């Protein structure tokens, strides 16, 4: 049998029908649903007189619009409230494998709760009406975001029409330096590839530095794959994967567990398999990263400087840098460490898991929020993460430092609730996108790791977190 990449194994095992032009009908194992992209899909089903094909594939929660404070007040914005109430009505009507509504103790970001309850299992195809579904590729799943019309299609048929992607291996070998995390790897990769470098590809992340990461770190890497333009991000199964899933509520039990593990261990790229493209990075050379512009590819090391467009020969790229600098209110050649921070956001489906909160707390412990920093939001990714963090006393560390400890949700990542920036404010954010207006109209987002965000919070500007040790 011809050697296959991990992506090729996942793809071929889910093809229901193959067209001559390469388009295939792919079976979907897990359908994640939230309140923003599902109402129209459910309405379309009703208008067509259809019912969901397999409700046992559905895991649903409210996350984008839910407030992260004063839950007793409910959802004040009428549009947000309507979306959450519509999700609730739809799921209660049709059913689901798991549903965590607003105020449920397990409610949280869909890409956090899926893995933590064992709804995300190796070998699955996973879709959601959300760009960062690629997160689940950390479990050797073929996972990607879909549009609202595709949400309806999956509900109705449990299948999707797809074009096969090309394959790319991003190999990161070596040992990460102190203070450097998975988020820094992800940003360094995007800085290398650009936001279009992965277009048309499914990226497998490999190498000794990736294998050394926890599942939380691998989820961060795969979460950001979409920001390099990739269709999906993947990491092969190893003992770290298996240990993480053991005893999760929805993971197989008993003999079924042993059978599942035997299959999961095959979910890796075969020796001799060919990738369409290979990119290599040296982990030891990766430093803490900070984005300075309005795209994740506009990234520098914390010891670097904002670029000078005058030195850029390509007129299109030069114009893009000029526009970004104008929006961000930055002068060319400004040292990254001199960029002031007005707000800090520690959260999102990229960096809101327990390991991320521990990382931030280790920096915040014994320190206080800088007077110039208006607000620091710490938003756990789920109710279970919040409970564990509180059991470890992490919330007390944050509160003692003057940070705000919030309820779970998407929060300031995309400002669909009340958590947002004011025009002109700079934010050190552990989220995944720094587009214009992403965290509020006129807000200026800088993407960083949890440790770097906490460091900026206590100093008032960006600083190499290694200097605070």
UniProtKB/Swiss-Prot annotation:
[4Fe-4S] cluster binds at residues 349, 410, 413. Pathway: Amino-acid biosynthesis; L-leucine biosynthesis; L-leucine from 3-methyl-2-oxobutanoate: step 2/4. Its EC number is 4.2.1.33. The keyword Protease does not apply. Binds 1 [4Fe-4S] cluster per subunit. Its cofactor is [4Fe-4S] cluster. GO terms for biological process: L-leucine biosynthetic process. InterPro entries: 3-IsopropMal_deHydase_lsu (IPR004430), Acnase/IPM_dHydase_lsu_aba_1/3 (IPR015931), Acoase/IPM_deHydtase_lsu_aba (IPR001030), Aconitase_4Fe-4S_BS (IPR018136), Aconitase_4Fe-4S_dom (IPR036008), IPM_dehydratase_rel_enz (IPR050067), IPMI_cat (IPR033941). It comes from the Bacteria. Belongs to the aconitase/IPM isomerase family. LeuC type 1 subfamily. This is 3-isopropylmalate dehydratase large subunit. It comes from Aromatoleum aromaticum (strain DSM 19018 / LMG 30748 / EbN1) (Azoarcus sp. (strain EbN1)). The lineage of its organism: Bacteria, Pseudomonadati, Pseudomonadota, Betaproteobacteria, Rhodocyclales. The gene is leuC.
């Amino acid at each position: 049998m011809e050697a296959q990449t991990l992506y090729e194994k996942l793809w071929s095992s889910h093809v229901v029908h193959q067209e001559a032009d390469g388009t295939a009908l792919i079976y979907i194992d897990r359908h994640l649903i939230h309140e923003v992209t599902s109402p129209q899909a459910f309405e379309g089903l009703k208008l067509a007189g259809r019912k969901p094909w397999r409700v046992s594939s559905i895991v649903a929660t409210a996350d984008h619009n839910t407030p992260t404070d004063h839950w007793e007040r409910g959802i004040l914005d009428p549009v947000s409230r309507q979306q959450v109430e519509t999700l609730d009505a739809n799921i209660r009507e049709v059913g689901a494998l798991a549903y965590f509504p607003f105020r449920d103790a397990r409610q949280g970001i869909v890409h956090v709760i899926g893995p933590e309850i064992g709804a995300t299992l190796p070998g699955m195809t996973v879709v959601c009406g959300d760009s960062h579904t690629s997160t689940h590729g950390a479990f050797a799943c073929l996972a990607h975001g879909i549009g609202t019309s595709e949400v309806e299609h999956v509900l109705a048929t449990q299948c999707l029409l797809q074009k096969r992607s090309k394959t790319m291996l991003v190999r990161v070998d070596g040992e990460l330096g102190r203070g450097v995390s998975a988020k820094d790897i992800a940003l360094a990769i995007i800085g290398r590839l650009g936001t279009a470098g992965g277009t048309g590809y499914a990226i497998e992340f490999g190498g000794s530095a990736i294998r050394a990461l926890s599942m939380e770190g691998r989820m961060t890497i795969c979460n950001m794959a979409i920001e390099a333009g990739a269709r999906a991000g993947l990491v092969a199964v190893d003992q770290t994967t298996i240990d993480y899933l053991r005893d999760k509520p929805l993971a197989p039990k008993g003999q079924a567990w042993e059978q599942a593990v035997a299959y999961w261990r095959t979910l890796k790229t075969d020796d001799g398999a060919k990738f369409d493209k290979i990119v290599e990075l040296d982990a030891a050379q990766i430093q803490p990263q900070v984005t300075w512009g309005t795209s994740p590819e506009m990234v520098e090391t914390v010891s670097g400087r904002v670029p000078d467009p005058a030195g850029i020969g390509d007129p299109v790229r030069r114009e893009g840098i000029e526009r970004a600098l104008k929006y961000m209110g930055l002068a060319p050649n400004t040292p990254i460490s001199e960029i002031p921070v007005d707000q800090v956001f520690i959260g999102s489906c990229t960096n809101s898991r327990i390991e991320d909160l521990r990382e931030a707390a280790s920096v915040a412990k014994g320190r206080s929020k800088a007077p110039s920093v208006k607000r620091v939001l710490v938003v756990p990714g789920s109710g279970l993460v919040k409970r564990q963090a509180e059991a470890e006393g992490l919330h007390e560390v944050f509160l003692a430092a003057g940070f705000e400890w919030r309820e779970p949700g998407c929060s300031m990542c995309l400002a669909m609730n009340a958590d947002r920036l004011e025009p002109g404010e700079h934010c050190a954010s552990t989220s995944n996108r720094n587009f214009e207006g992403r965290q509020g109209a006129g807000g200026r987002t800088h993407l960083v790791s949890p440790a770097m965000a906490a460091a900026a919070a206590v100093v008032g500007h960006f600083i190499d977190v290694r200097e605070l040790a």
